[in-house]
Amino acid sequence: IEYLKECLPSMDQDPAKRLRKILEKRGVTFHLQSAATAIINKTVLFEHKGENQTVESDLILMATGRTPNTNGIGLDTVGIDYDRHGIKTDDNLMTSVPDIYAIGDVNGRQMLAHAAEMQGRQVVDHLLGIKRHYRPDLVPSAVFTYPELAAVGPTEQQLKAEGRKYKVYKSSFRSNGRAVLMCTTEGLVK
């Protein structure tokens, strides 16, 4: 049950849609543009286009996104500015209190371990007077499904929305020798 038009809305929609179709062939049912309204035992109630529906399941996994875990870490005590999106920081990841930095999940930027590592390096470099240009748009992300879905850089939809010129290159795994030998030709590189 997905609220938006496509599963994996933060990923490029071309490979996300392709993954959805592969999973549907394997028996996964998607209810897109639907809003879960309640869970009663093993039944999920949801609304789709104004119509109430239900789905029964042996197991329910609810993924509602990530939120910065800033509760109970004393932000108010030291006067650090934050909101529901996380601790507010400048370009060097310094908080509203000089010499206190926020990296990783608490700043609400990219909630990925390797992004936190890069942010940590950025802070250390800043403290040492080394200029580092951190490119959050080039932090890779992955969805560990089969086949896997991975991305780095902006999506085609983001580029269109920003009015940026771009070229799209695609290569099917059907032309990849390793994929052919392993009988895993469903993938693509975009």
What annotation goes with each model-predicted range?
Residues 3, 11, 33-35, 63-65, ...:
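Fold-independent oxyanion-binding glycine-rich loops
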Residues 28-29, 43, 58-60, 99-101, ...:
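Structural motif
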Residues 40-42, 97, 183-187:
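A short, glycine/Asx- and small/polar-enriched loop/turn
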Residues 105-112, 145, 174-181:
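Glycine-rich phosphate/pyrophosphate-binding beta-alpha loops
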Residues 53-82, 151-190:
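C-terminal catalytic lobe of FAD-dependent flavoproteins
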